[in-house]
């Protein structure tokens, strides 16, 4: 049986399509800008489209009004997207259909194991419920791994090897609390939107092999991946909403854009005060070099909570 109709994305051409997909758990900070700017420049330098998706499928983590603020921040920093914003909260039917297809193909199963049990055996799920034929009551849904992906090629970093046990784990695609898992939603939506290359932060390297395994189960073409360096605070922690990284400044966006370009190893206008945001970005697109982007994380105290 072929995947249901909605899962097919008819590609009319071979145009490059990139995306930025923030979760509305708070405002964008400097680390978020790195991911947004890097994906934007890579798409525009390839004469491609740049899409924005709001990943609002985890209501307990969402901050009211954050999604709208994120969109305003992107516009303030000159990062204008193509087409309509895709909201994951409006895509539940697609995720349900994907889950149903996987279940019909015998590629998923219900699991009632608790987090405490999994932690007691070392933190990696052991397939305990694979042959127990549980029903959906008080159960999560796990993928039945067929061909685990243990490595992938990153267009910046080369071949990346995954932890073998993690790669072979039957991971959750629908949570016990009824929420759709990130790995399922992101794969279904990236395919639906025709994304050809995913440019994001290096903190998302780990789930990549799981996402590739889902692409393969569905029989879809796997996109290319680029994982950008992370901005760290002076304590060595990633700038994040959880670590209280300050929101992007609401004033003149140009000095922050210049700092982000320099962070990514790119040529920046020496006399940026003489240029508009649009001109700075046009120059950045023209001079974009992926090979100049550093692979390692960088401490950036200027935009961390240490400077607040």
From Swiss-Prot:
Names of the cofactor(s): Zn(2+)
Q: Which domain of life does the UniProt lineage start with?
A: Bacteria
List the InterPro entries.
Glu-Q_tRNA(Asp)_Synthase, Glu/Gln-tRNA-synth, Glu/Gln-tRNA-synth_Ib_cat-dom, GluQ/Sye, Rossmann-like_a/b/a_fold
Residues that coordinate or bind L-glutamate: 19-23, 55, 182, 200
Give GO terms for biological process.
glutamyl-tRNA aminoacylation; tRNA wobble base modification
Tell me its EC number(s), please.
6.1.1.-
Enzyme class, first EC level, given as a word: ligase
For binding ATP, which residues are annotated in this chain's numbering? Answer: 241
Membrane-spanning residues where? none
Q: Which GO terms describe its cellular component?
A: cytosol
Q: Which residues bind Zn(2+)?
A: 111, 113, 125, 129
User: Where would I look for the motif 'KMSKS' region in this sequence?
Assistant: 238-242
Q: How is the cofactor bound?
A: Binds 1 zinc ion per subunit.
What would be an example GO MF term here? zinc ion binding
Renumbered to this chain, motif 'HIGH' region spans 22-32
Which Pfam family, any one of them, does this sequence belong to? tRNA-synt_1c
Q: Which UniProt keywords apply?
A: Aminoacyl-tRNA synthetase, ATP-binding, Ligase, Metal-binding, Nucleotide-binding, Zinc
Among HAMAP family, the record links this protein to: Glu_Q_tRNA_synth (MF_01428)
Q: What does this gene product do?
A: Catalyzes the tRNA-independent activation of glutamate in presence of ATP and the subsequent transfer of glutamate onto tRNA(Asp). Glutamate is transferred on the 2-amino-5-(4,5-dihydroxy-2-cyclopenten-1-yl) moiety of the queuosine in position 34 of the tRNA(Asp), the wobble position of the QUC anticodon. Does not transfer glutamate to either tRNA(Glu) or tRNA(Gln). The incapacity of the glutamylated tRNA(Asp) to bind elongation factor Tu suggests that it is not involved in ribosomal protein biosynthesis.
What family, per the record?
Belongs to the class-I aminoacyl-tRNA synthetase family. GluQ subfamily.
> What's the name of the protein?
Glutamyl-Q tRNA(Asp) synthetase
This chain's source organism reads: Escherichia coli (strain K12)
* Gene name per UniProt: gluQ
């Amino acid at each position: 049986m072929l995947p249901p109709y909605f899962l097919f994305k008819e590609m009319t051409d071979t145009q490059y399509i990139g995306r930025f997909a923030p979760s509305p758990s708070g405002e964008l900070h400097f680390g978020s800008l790195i991911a947004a700017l890097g994906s934007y420049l890579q798409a525009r330098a390839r004469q491609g489209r740049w899409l924005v998706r709001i990943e609002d499928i985890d209501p307990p983590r969402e901050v009211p009004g954050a999604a709208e603020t994120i969109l305003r921040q992107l516009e303030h920093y000159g990062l204008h997207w193509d087409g309509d914003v895709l909201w994951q909260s409006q895509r539940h039917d697609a995720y349900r259909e994907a889950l149903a297809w996987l279940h019909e193909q015998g590629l998923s199963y219900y699991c009632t194991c608790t987090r405490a049990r999994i932690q007691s055996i070392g933190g990696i799920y052991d397939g305990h419920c694979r042959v127990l034929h549980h029903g959906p009551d008080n159960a999560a849904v796990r993928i039945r791994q067929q061909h685990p992906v243990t490595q992938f090629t990153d267009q910046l970093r080369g071949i990346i090897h995954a932890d073998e046990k993690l790669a072979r784990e039957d991971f959750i695609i629908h949570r016990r609390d009824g929420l759709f898992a990130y790995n399922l939603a992101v794969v279904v939506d990236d395919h639906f939107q025709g994304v050809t290359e995913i440019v994001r932060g290096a903190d998302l390297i780990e789930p990549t092999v799981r996402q590739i395994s889902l692409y393969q189960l569905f029989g879809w073409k796997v996109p290319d991946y680029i994982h950008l360096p992370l901005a760290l605070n002076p304590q060595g922690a990633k700038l994040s909403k959880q670590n209280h990284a300050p929101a992007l400044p609401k004033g003149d966006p140009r000095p922050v854009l210049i700092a982000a370009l320099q962070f990514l190893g790119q040529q920046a206008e020496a006399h940026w005060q003489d240029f508009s945001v649009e001109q700075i970005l046009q120059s950045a697109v023209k001079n974009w070099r992926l090979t100049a982007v550093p692979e390692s994380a960088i401490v950036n105290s200027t935009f961390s909570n240490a400077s607040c």
